[in-house]
Amino acid sequence: MHNSPIKTVVIVGGGTSGWMTAAALSTVLRGQYSIRLVESDEIGIIGVGEATIPMIQRFNKVVGIDENEFLRETQGTFKLGIEFVNWGKLGDRYMHGFGRIGQDLWTVPFEQYWRKMRALGKAQDLESYCITRMASKANKFMQPPSDVTNSPLNDIAYAYHFDASLYAKFLSKIAIQRGVVRTEGRIVQVTQREGDGYVDAVVLASGERIEGDLFIDCSGMRGLLIEETLKTGYEDWSHWLPCNRALAVPCESAATLTPYTRSTAHRAGWQWRIPLQHRIGNGHVYCSSRISDDEATATLLANLDGKPLADPRMFKFTVGMRNKAWNRNVIAVGLAGGFLEPLESTSIHLVQAAVSQLIDFFPDQGFSSADIDEYNRMSRFHFERIRDFIILHYHQNQRTDSDFWKDCAHMAVPESLVEKMKLFRSRGRIVRFDNELFAEVAWLQVMQGQNLQTQGYNPLVDLQSEEDTVEYLESVRNVIAKCVEVMPEHSAYVASHCAAAKMGM
């Protein structure tokens, strides 16, 4: 009996997490399983402007989503990276651009040659050698061309900005077309099997009982199944990431449609800016023990590009993760599994990663403990590596204008991050742990942008003469500059490929 296949999958909660899960499972399971999604119209979803990372392209391709249609339906724009303002110190500005920087030479990473020449005053800023950073600076965008080879244009890596609630709506249509049954209703009771405590049904206010074999908890931070029912426990990381509230508000669009997200550090947190076709999504993530809600609201509203289109909405959170993402026959996806502030636009990716792992470890009714343990190990690894990357932004700062930033600079950080920073300080080397999300080039840009100083460079760089290295760097810079010149404006590219219908608020 234990090897019998799963018959019914019940997804508790809609929103982006629920409908991403439903769309992916209905595609991969090909109608061989019953999939039900339960959501209540009484419960609002956190539908703000959402920024993503390039991995989302893989998800959309698996589901079979046409890119231009998706962007039209979600008021979406393209994203080449994230600009960070005032993060190292007041007045600092740098970008984490997607994709490659320069071109490696022999077995030595490009940035090692750059580092030597930069110290000698013979190299430009790092951004000059990254096509996505230079294109962002010029507000240019194009997709990698299929008819051009051996060009920096092939290295254009990109993601998207879109309206999260519209994305959920878009995915719901796909999932329902592929057999997912949506049930509207408020869950008032969760029942468990005697003996092992597995969830066997959810009961709605209407009295309807919905049974299932596998339950996916997409109920948000409350964790209706994973926490309120199974008491899984939550690991609090607020001693490393003390921000615990966010205010979100849309505003009128600016004149220029920028192809990047912006993060501006404030006195006790930071503000996001996400450009959509019809508006700009804004939010202020802050620490409530260092700034009042009224002050945080005033800071947010004082730093908008245009007129606010709604009243700010507040969200309270504790950064951290569940002790287990998979407990018995319940898998937590999205905010039900944990929360990391969206500084590096990882919220959607964490949903994608959870769904991908679920597909890799899809169970039968035996619910293998080995599979569950490995799923939980992978989930923890994924969360912890992203956690470290976010902590780096806070910890490696030189700001002295507030106790918040001074405390972040002096706090103890995870040993895994200590080792990464120590290695970089030595000779600028970066080691990527196993399959962690962020590649070496991402760590490089943030470490460099946050002014983490190195004591040297790879000695193999000295095998090439300074003259040849300068010539090589200059050739890379010139080719990238010429490529950016031929790229269209981001706004023009959106208008010609994926312009959405005009819509009001």
Regions found by a protein language model. Give the residues of each.
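N-terminal Rossmann-like FAD-binding beta1-loop-alpha1 element of flavoenzymes
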Residues: K7-Y33
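Conserved mid-domain beta->alpha element of the FAD-binding
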Residues: G320-R385
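Long, low-complexity C-terminal extensions of enzymes
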Residues: D360-M505
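Predominantly flavin-linked oxidoreductase catalytic cores and closely associated redox partners
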Residues: T149-A296, V355
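Glycine-rich FAD pyrophosphate-binding loop
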Residues: S26-V48
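Conserved FAD/dinucleotide-binding core of flavoprotein oxidoreductases
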Residues: H266-F317, A336-L350, F361-Q365
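Dinucleotide-binding Rossmann-like beta1-alpha1 core, especially the glycine-rich loop
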Residues: V48-S136
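Conserved N-terminal helical subregion
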Residues: M95-Q189
